[in-house]
Regions:
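Bacterial N-terminal signal peptides
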Residues: 6-17
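Formylglycine-dependent sulfatase
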Residues: 2, 19-317
């Protein structure tokens, strides 16, 4: 079975109340969120070798905001901020604590609630808020699933093809590679599994054209099918549909053909300036064992050279 990803976005820039007051038809709105996506998108120029034709086509048909930065460098508070319109310094939400535990956010309207209050039917799937709240949605078929994961017959593990000590970081952040590299050869109850915590659901893989869909592919298919269903329905209400993709967040697994697009020898690494962080307050706030620094150091220790480790990781990204 061939897998494809259909991305559709409509950006609503006019306040809904103003549209209603003017007697104009309210548009249907699709919101797409990608986790950990940086500016390595061709039209943004973040990396000279980036190949993102569908994102480029989407950008060329609309407006691209090149200086729109995240409100917080981790996903939970950043998502809570842009889906409520409240800065972290106003809400106090800076870490991974559930956003709805903060009084300011408890008493604020989310984007989803705002659409519903203006007569929209609100549906979503995948990873949108880091901490999901079902009451925000009329439909939400699939919660965030970071899978597939490598499974050793007992538990989720780092992918066996990733060298140590990086693999020991674990099944999420310590793993990347092509889907064709089935963990443990797929024998004896081992192989790929989906990522719902507390459950073990195998993901069937024969080859890249004969396999179960990844969670992101499943969400893309749901979004495309649901949009088609809306088009056939008689419901007079406009819809707000949001779909959240996990990738390129770790674990970075993808069909092999995408790895083949970027041979390791040809990859260009970004410039890394010696002592570039020395004039910042990074180490005044964080220790050398903070996740990012530790992961970077461990990646370099896992390959013959730091450059080889960075290229392997960059290829997967």
């Amino acid at each position: 079975m061939k897998h494809s990803l259909m991305l559709t976005v409509v950006l609503l820039l006019t306040p809904l109340a103003a549209l209603q007051a003017a007697g104009l038809k309210r548009p249907n709105v699709v919101l797409i969120v990608c986790d950990d996506l940086n500016d390595y998108v061709a039209h943004l120029g973040g990396h000279p070798q980036a190949r993102t034709p569908h994102m480029d086509a989407l950008a060329h048909g609309g407006v691209s905001f090149r200086r729109s930065y995240c409100q917080d460098p981790i996903c939970a508070p950043s998502r809570a901020s842009f889906l409520t319109g409240i800065y972290p310094f106003r809400s106090g939400d800076f870490t991974f604590r559930p956003w709805f535990e903060f009084p300011v956010l408890q008493n604020s309207r989310t984007l989803m609630e705002h659409f519903r209050a203006n007569g929209y039917y609100v549906v979503g799937s995948g990873k949108l808020m880091h901490h999901h709240r079902q009451s925000d949605w009329d439909e939400y078929p699939y919660k965030a699933d970071y899978g597939p994961f490598a499974y050793d017959g007992k538990e989720r593990v780092g992918h066996p093809s990733v060298p140590e000590p990086y693999r020991s970081i674990g099944p999420v952040d310590g793993s990347f590679g092509p889907l064709s590299d089935v963990p443990f050869g797929g024998r004896g109850g081992k192989g790929w599994i989906y990522g719902a915590w507390g459950k073990v659901k195998p993901m069937r893989y024969v080859n890249d054209d004969d396999r179960d869909p990844t969670p992101d592919e499943r969400n893309a298919r749901w979004a495309a099918d649901r949009i088609g269903q809306f088009a056939r329905e008689k419901d007079a209400r406009p819809f707000f549909l949001a779909v959240g993709f996990i990738r390129p967040h770790t674990p970075m697994y993808a069909p092999k053909k995408y790895f083949d697009l970027f041979p390791l020898k040809s990859l260009q690494l970004p410039v890394i300036k010696p002592g570039d962080a020395a004039d910042t307050h990074y180490r005044d706030v964080f220790s050398d064992e903070i996740k990012g620094l530790r992961y970077y150091r461990t990646l370099g220790q896992s390959y013959p050279t730091v450059e080889e480790g960075l290229k392997a990781f960059l290829q997967a990204y």
